[in-house]
């Protein structure tokens, strides 16, 4: 039986875990830069499959997904992949924010968020320059 190789790299890779196509498109437009590689999955099982092969620098995680809640997935990711930064995004109320942060999310953004908010969060967590590429 062969072991799967897990790819790790210093490149700035971001995994977006979001089931809404429009939100994914918006995030892709906002975040497409030469120094960031974006990957996208639509559910938690897809995220787990992706993480078993490639570990990103940062995960943008929606809360309400077809196969579970992102807020519950945060603690799992932080235990198994402690170096991965997590930006939780949700349209739910402040109680979700509190739980997400308690579970280990590095930042929380409430939908709808602005381009500046998401870029500020990512730049801060990945130590990227403050200038805007667009």
Feature-to-residue mapping (PLM):
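Active-site residues of response regulator receiver
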Residues: 62
């Amino acid at each position: 039986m062969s072991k799967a190789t897990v790819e790790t790299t210093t490149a700035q890779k971001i995994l977006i875990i979001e089931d809404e196509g429009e939100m994914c498109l918006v995030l892709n437009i906002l975040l497409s830069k030469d120094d960031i590689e974006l990957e996208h999955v639509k559910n938690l099982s897809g995220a787990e499959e992706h993480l078993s092969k490639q570990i990103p620098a940062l995960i943008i995680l929606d809360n309400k997904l077809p196969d579970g809640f992102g807020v519950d997935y945060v603690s799992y990711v932080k235990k198994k992949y402690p170096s991965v930064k997590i930006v939780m995004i949700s349209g739910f109320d402040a109680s979700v924010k509190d739980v997400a942060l308690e579970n280990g999310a590095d930042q929380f953004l409430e939908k709808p968020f602005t381009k500046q908010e998401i870029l500020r969060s990512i730049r801060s967590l990945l130590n990227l320059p403050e200038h805007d590429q667009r």
